[in-house]
């Protein structure tokens, strides 16, 4: 009946979502119900589909594609867009061609693409969340053949950083989809072990040989327990040892040096993760349930998710409350790079800013904070091109140096040549010119932290595990060492391969004296080219790995 038309007494029973009325089979919408012209046109299209469904099923229901999209225009942020005035027609017969184009150009193209604009992974694969959701479900229902799975690259390309959920008006979490896919693949033996093998190896190392826990000296329990995580001390031992000195003196805190389980979580290995969490929970209970002090936002997040009963404190918040702590002014001005998992931890963010401000550094806030540096999800091997794109975008977010408070962010930016400092570099005036530790040095740093803590708190001497190839000495150029670190090849693996080749005689010797050997492990095959300089000393010429296991039989 049109605008201001007859409603036949049905307006009070009108459902604005389904456009139904109290009279069966009678629908009502558009201008008659006070809807503006453009929305009336959209309602006409929607109502046609609702009515079609009604005729087929006898029920009025929203089509699946429209369940979450109604009025999504109201979620959109048009900041930065020019407010253009309505184009006035010069002729009563209608717009000229130029006027029509000018009027059409006023349209904001109101399609919600907030996640697309905030997530390189979504943009890289050009798939919006609804499509990804369907593919994840379909993928999980596929048969036994890995080749039938279509989502492999996408599954392992996600940082699982939570940015998509944080910006989505209705909280769609693509990371949770990809996490489900990873767990499902591992459960059904359709995972790609090589994508996570290196970091699972690190996890196993930090939860075994490098693991250490103790209350304060001569105590059996403690009120506070410092949990620095696994990467902080591996990157710089003083990032653990010096804060612990402070916490022990001020709070009589104990310390637990280990891994929260992030590598197992990102690999979808629920059993490995659960075993680690239960071990930590058991230790925590035995120490009379102390408050845990965190220096890593991701550790804090994992514990909050899986052990919510544990009371938490941030190292940086505690330090910010102590006016005697005045960090060194390593930069005149810097941009604050907040880690993705500190997004909802406003107290940790504030604590770091107080410390940086106390140093006299002028802080610049990033336009789009809390985006993953690229490390998250361990997606680097699954999609090197996307990893490079993400890290470049984060590097370029500001031309100023970065202040970070995540060891992984520090590692990524320093590898990419971005000037940056961890807030603990500032607190303890640590020389930023110190070389980025190699993968081998990171393991040595972690063991050095354990050695010093064990001697100090228990009086015992720590003796690292010994291997038959430890006595081998390798000569590696700086350029090659950088390449090996990029390939995630640790010096110890090269030593083992050379030792194994000498024991078995399985190696190739060329006329110029260069030897080539290989070593097959559970999911990787190593290849090494080297020259023997003298007994027990070798010059490495090149090395690489195939992220697959070569079968030597047949």
Give names to the regions the model predicted.
Residues 437-438, 442, 449-554:
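Ribonuclease/tRNase effector modules and their secretory precursors
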Residues 126-307, 444-455:
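Iron-sulfur-cluster electron-transfer modules
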Residues 107-115, 119, 158-164, 168, ...:
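Short cysteine clusters
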Residues 1-157:
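Ferredoxin-type iron-sulfur electron-transfer modules and their immediate structural context
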Residues 75-89, 116-136, 166-184, 266-270, ...:
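Iron-sulfur (Fe-S) cluster-binding segments and ferredoxin-like electron-carrier domains
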Residues 27, 225, 335, 401-403:
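Conserved beta-strand elements of the Class I
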Residues 231-314, 343-454:
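Cofactor-cradling patches in redox/metallo enzymes
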Residues 37, 45, 49, 313-346, ...:
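Catalytic cores of enzyme domains
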């Amino acid at each position: 009946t049109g605008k201001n038309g007859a409603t036949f007494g049905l307006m009070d029973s009108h459902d604005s979502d389904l456009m139904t009325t109290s009279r069966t089979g009678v629908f009502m919408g558009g201008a008659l119900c006070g809807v503006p012209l453009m929305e009336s046109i959209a309602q006409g299209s929607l109502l046609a589909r609702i009515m079609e469904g009604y005729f087929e099923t006898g029920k009025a229901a929203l089509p699946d594609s429209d369940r979450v999209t109604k009025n999504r225009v109201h979620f959109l942020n048009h900041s930065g867009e020019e407010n253009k005035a309505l184009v006035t027609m010069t002729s009563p017969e209608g717009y000229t061609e130029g006027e029509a184009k000018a009027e059409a150009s006023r349209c904001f193209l109101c399609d919600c693409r907030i996640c697309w604009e905030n997530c390189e992974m979504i943009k890289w694969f050009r798939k919006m969340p609804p499509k990804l959701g369907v593919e994840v479900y379909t993928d999980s229902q596929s048969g036994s053949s890995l080749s039938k799975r279509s989502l492999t690259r996408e599954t392992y390309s996600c940082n699982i950083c939570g940015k998509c959920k944080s910006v989505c008006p209705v909280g769609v979490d693509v990371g949770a989809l990809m996490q489900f896919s990873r767990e499902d693949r591992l459960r059904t033996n359709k995972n790609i072990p090589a994508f996570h093998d290196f970091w699972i190896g690190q996890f196993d190392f930090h939860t075994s040989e490098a693991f250490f826990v103790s209350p304060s000296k001569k105590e059996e329990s403690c009120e506070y327990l410092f949990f620095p995580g696994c990467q902080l001390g591996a990157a710089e031992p003083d990032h653990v040892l010096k804060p612990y000195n402070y916490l022990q003196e001020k709070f009589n805190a104990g310390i637990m040096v280990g891994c929260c389980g992030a590598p197992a979580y990102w690999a979808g290995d629920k059993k490995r993760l659960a075993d680690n969490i239960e071990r930590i929970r058991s230790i925590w209970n035995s120490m009379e349930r102390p408050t845990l002090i965190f220096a890593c936002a991701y550790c804090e997040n994992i514990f909050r998710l899986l052990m919510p009963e544990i009371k938490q404190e941030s190292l940086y918040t505690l330090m910010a409350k102590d006016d005697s702590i005045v960090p060194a002014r390593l930069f005149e001005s810097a941009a604050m790079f907040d880690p993705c998992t500190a997004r909802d931890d406003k107290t940790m963010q504030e604590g770091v800013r107080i410390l940086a401000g106390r140093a006299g550094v002028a802080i610049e806030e990033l336009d789009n904070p809390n985006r993953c540096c690229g490390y998250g999800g361990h997606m680097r091997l699954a999609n090197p091109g996307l990893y490079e794109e993400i890290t470049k975008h984060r590097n370029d977010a500001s031309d100023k140096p970065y202040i970070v408070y995540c060891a992984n962010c520090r590692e990524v930016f320093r590898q990419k040549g971005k000037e940056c400092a961890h807030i603990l570099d500032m607190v303890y005036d640590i020389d930023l010119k110190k070389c980025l530790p190699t993968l081998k040095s990171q393991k040595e740093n972690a063991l050095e932290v354990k050695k010093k803590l064990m001697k100090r708190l228990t009086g015992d001497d720590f003796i690292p595990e010994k291997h038959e190839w430890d006595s081998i000495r390798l000569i590696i150029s700086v350029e090659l060492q950088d390449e090996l670190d990029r390939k995630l090849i640790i010096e110890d693996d090269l030593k083992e391969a050379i030792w194994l080749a000498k024991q078995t005689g399985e190696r190739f010797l060329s006329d110029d004296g260069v030897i080539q050997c290989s070593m097959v492990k559970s999911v990787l095959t190593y290849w090494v080219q080297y020259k023997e300089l003298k007994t027990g000393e070798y010059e490495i010429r090149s090395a690489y790995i195939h992220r697959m296991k070569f079968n030597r039989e047949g």
